[in-house]
Amino acid sequence: MKVAASVKKMCRNCKVIRRKGVVRVICTDPRHKQRQG
């Protein structure tokens, strides 16, 4: 899980979603998981 100021899609499987006001990236590749903070 990366904590980044700006979250970006790293591949075509990445999806940017919003959970409880937190922007997150979910992906089939666990290395691509990110959250904004």
From Swiss-Prot:
Coiled-coil annotated spans: none
One Gene Ontology biological process: translation
Record SUPFAM superfamilies: Ribosomal protein L36
Keyword annotations from UniProtKB, A to Z: Ribonucleoprotein, Ribosomal protein
Superkingdom of the source species: Bacteria
One Gene Ontology molecular-function label: structural constituent of ribosome
GO CC annotation, single: ribonucleoprotein complex
Tagged with keyword Transmembrane: no
The keyword Ribonucleoprotein appears for this protein: yes
One protein family per Pfam: Ribosomal_L36
Entry's family note: Belongs to the bacterial ribosomal protein bL36 family.
Protein name per the record: Large ribosomal subunit protein bL36
